[in-house]
């Protein structure tokens, strides 16, 4: 008997789920049961769903896509065929201050592949170029030497000048004017004073900026704390266009793109990566035009139509993306887009490091009324935005729509502090979810990797 599933991989590929897919494994245990192996930390948990209750599966094609060339070849091809600009080697001629912005330790950008090719391209046009690599930490902590060495390798560490951005170092920040939103645009002095500004990065779905990469190298990458906080204000986060995979009408994206233009970001090199963090697609050139091509490719592999259900199972893709609860909000937003109002999200996240943010934890622990919490966020002026407010606001939004049963290694009290229902196995989570929805004919949608899909409502 053949296995038949109602599942969506992308708009172009429906009902073609492969049993050997590296992200999800299904088998027909018996005629009326499907079994899913779902990422959880460095392990996998099994979810068994009866056929009559399975609404569908939302699965990205990203991790099963096979690139036609190696990552290095893809990046080199992109450098040789830029979109919307001359070649970088030609742009480098005569330039005295060249700055290449690179992502920090929190992003799985394959810089060991990309950066040597970018530097070689610059030096082809300008062998004597004074190049500085600027690490775009945004609001994150500083990147350590060990992390830089792991990112770039020994040759770049030994031979290149590397500076780590500090969003609070006022002596090395420069005011460039007002953003369209009214906030002050303040960025790193090295970036502002460069006569050739380049950025490497990667493109993935982003749960309020639409997509990562491109313009984000400037804002939040090398912007001041004040600028980032204003951009992440509650009004922007509440905007219906500030969602995964959406850039048109997205006020956060609009400010970011304006910032990139104001900073004169001349050239980007961005990749799309697979689960092993290897490039499977690359673009280079104009910070908007090249980024558009990259995000269109990504959307073609990741975009799926919502399958409404009473219960939605999601994950954060396992380690290293499910190390804490704060991180796991991203995977929950994929479920938020397809769960029915008043339904249940079962979120699988090892969360071995706990909550992941002091303010994030305290906000939910100390306020039991989610509507009052949301009002506090929305009443806060953009210039009064505080750290992690955006993540808390998004989390509160989805908790107002659905109950979250959180499968993790966390103590029950911590999970309950964050307004969720604790569970420590898939079986326990399903039983609790069924008790909450109180329906005999409940439907379940499964999202094997909530961070790699763009769910269209």
Q: What does each model-found stretch correspond to?
A:
Residues 97-108, 132-138, 313-315:
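Short glycine-rich or small-residue beta-strand-to-loop segments that form or flank ligand, phosphate
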Residues 108-126, 328-338:
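Histidine-anchored nucleotide/phosphate-binding helix
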Residues 143-211:
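An acidic, phosphate/nucleotide-engaging active-site surface
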Residues 179, 188-270, 274-277, 422-423:
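Conserved phosphate- and dinucleotide-binding cores of soluble alpha/beta proteins
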Residues 242-319:
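Membrane-embedded hairpin module used as a gating/binding unit in multi-pass transport
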Residues 328-329, 333-457:
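C-terminal non-catalytic interaction/assembly regions of soluble proteins
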